[in-house]
Each structure stands twice: as C-alpha cells, then as structure tokens.
C-alpha cells in the first residue's frame, strides 16, 4: 500500500480542532485500553510524539501515539544539506538579519524557479523575530516550486508550519495520513511531523509562518458567543494511511534554521494507526464566519482572527493569523476601508486572491507587505478619496478577495534577502504621497 500523490485523495477527514482522534488503516491496529502494549498489533512499534511538555495542563497538553512499521529513530546520521540554504531562525543582528528600517515595505511575488525546484529547495525566509533555539517568535517564509518532492521527506524541529498556498494545489503526505490543500485553504504541520509535498498543478507558490512558540489555537470568542469566526468542526485532520516502501530515500530536517539530510532506507509514512490530539490539519478560509459592524465604525481587525499563538502576557498574542475575506460592509456614515493606523504590533500581509480593499494598486496576489511597530500605514490616496465620497446608506460587498496577515507582538525583522531582492518595491511609499490636505478651519 502506498500514499499515491499522483491523484487526489479519496479518503475522508476527521472533523474538529485538536480533538482526541483515533484512526487506523488496518482493523485492530490500535491497541485497546493502553498506549504501549508489550506487543503491538501487526508487529508494529508504539511511539509517542509530544508537542508540549509532559506536565502541561490537560487542556493544553498535545501528544499523539503512533503505531508504525519502524520507529522514527531508524535512519543514518545527519549531515549538512547540500541544496539551497536560504532559511533564517535567529533574528538578532547578523549577516542574515541587518538593522530593521522603519520604512513601510512591500514586495512583488516571488518568481517561479527556472530550474527544477521542490518545496524544500524553494523555501526562503523573508522576515521573523525571536529565536527557534529559544522556542519563541516566528519565521515568515515564502515558497516557489515547480516539481514534486521525489523520495525526499522533510520535517521542522524549529516550529509548526502554517502554510498558506497562493498558487497551485499541494498534495501533502504525512506520517498521520494525507492532506490535499488548495489556494483559499491553509494547512498546519506540527513541529517534528515528517511530510512530503507533491505539486499536481506544476508550479506552486505561497506563504509560511513557522511558529516557534506556543501552539496555534482557536481564539476565545468572548461576547461573540459560542459560534463564529473559524468554527472547530471545519478543521480537518487526516485519517490514518500508510505505505510500506523501502529504497534509497532522503530525510531532510530543519533544526535551528539550518537544513540537514540523512539517508533513510524506508518511507517514514509507515504509521498504520494513531490516536491523540497532536496532528496535521487543514482549514478552508472560505468557511470563516465573518463578524462586522451593522451600525457604524470599522471594528478592530481582531474580529478577523483565525488562529493565535498565545504569549505569556494575558490578552497579548505572540502571533495572530488574521484574514480579510469577502464580506458585506453596511456601516453608515463610516469610512469603510481599513483606517489609517499605527500599531504597537507588527504586521506582515499577503494576498491569496483578488485585491485588498485598502490598496487599489501595487499589492498583488503572491506579493507581501510589512508594516512594523509604529510605522504609519493605511489606505492609499485613491482608495481614501473614493471611500470618502461613497454612499454609505447602501451596503457594499467586498468580493473576490482573500488577504491575510501574520501579526506579532515583537518587531518583524526582514532578512538580508528580503531587503536586497529585486522584488522589493522601492516606490511603495509613493502610494501615500498623493493624499491631499483637506483641512479648513472655517468649515467643520
């Protein structure tokens, strides 16, 4: 049996966010009533994968038990990866991380590679903060690839990977089963989980937030109530599926921002059954239940929060993943686009599809922008003039769009690559220079 990534998956998914799942690809493969029997069914090995400390409170404790053909320890020693090394995980001053300018920054899309390039080879770090070694902060990567991973498997020991495809579907095989992910969906691969990516559409491009800190979770809803935003039932986790395949394969590991490779003589997708609450998942952003004002004013963008990584300060997240999906705007006597803003947090934005309602030009699908702590930003001149003159007695639908934001409590530091790349737009600041003075002290 193999996980055939040449065609779409046929198996269904398990529904729910961080549930205690139990799934088996062969009947009776899950031990009954215990985790580590003296002899596991079918001659399998029992292995625990821990995503949190053993002593984490039960409501926050994340782990899974895997029943596999060979333990994860079975591979040759690691050595430095000889392919592209464009990843950064430490965001203090260094050759890879120059001083962070206070300028507003914006980039054109990462170009598709000319040479054959798989998902691992196509990764490049644009920005980040904190430290993978200290397990705090994040790294923001882009990927651009044009071939499937062939007999190569990958995992990150540095953090969980929040993957946002912008172009091209991803068929992702993992130790836990398979995820098929398309633009408008996201996938989260937990720290340490081995996976491989096939590209059924050829070219693929997208964004990744690698979370070094506390695991992503659904936000509390407060006075919104018991439903709304991203609903737990819409998060999908793979059912167990395995392959028993031997050969000359390569295992690539990311540790402290560096890539390492090891020879492995079998496929690590040999998990026949598993149970637990630490597993990959995907979510369709089109299912997000958008909340907004039906009287006046534009609420804070926290109403668009999909997932959060909490910090040690109550109410202050280390990372927020926010989206700006299609939605109705109905507020009267209100400037409806996102307002002008300076933020104590830092904001890295991307665009999956369409146009962002605060920027009429220049911010295109696959592109990105960075507005760091206290850098002024907001709608461009054309957007401001149009929105200031629009008829707000009638509702308006923002349609055919999907923008998102990685917002962090600490400064997002662009890498040397991000500041030197030809995709950096040198004239981004010009979008605000046409904003006119309207002040008239004689006319309130």
UniProtKB/Swiss-Prot annotation:
Pathway: Amino-acid degradation; L-phenylalanine degradation; acetoacetate and fumarate from L-phenylalanine: step 4/6
Record protein name field: Homogentisate 1,2-dioxygenase
Physiological role: Involved in the catabolism of homogentisate (2,5-dihydroxyphenylacetate or 2,5-OH-PhAc), a central intermediate in the degradation of phenylalanine and tyrosine. Catalyzes the oxidative ring cleavage of the aromatic ring of homogentisate to yield maleylacetoacetate.
GO terms for biological process, alphabetical: L-phenylalanine catabolic process; tyrosine catabolic process
Pfam families listed in its UniProt record: HgmA_C, HgmA_N
Species classification: Bacteria, Pseudomonadati, Pseudomonadota, Betaproteobacteria, Burkholderiales
NCBIfam families linked: hmgA
Catalytic machinery residues: 298
GO molecular function: homogentisate 1,2-dioxygenase activity; iron ion binding
Similarity field: Belongs to the homogentisate dioxygenase family.
Required cofactor(s): Fe cation
Entries under SUPFAM superfamilies matching the protein: RmlC-like cupins
Subunit structure: Hexamer; dimer of trimers.
One Gene Ontology cellular component annotation held by this UniProt entry: cytoplasm
InterPro entries: HgmA_C (IPR046451), HgmA_N (IPR046452), Homogentis_dOase (IPR005708), Homogentis_dOase_bac (IPR022950), RmlC-like_jellyroll (IPR014710), RmlC_Cupin_sf (IPR011051)
Binding residues annotated for homogentisate, in chain numbering: 356, 377
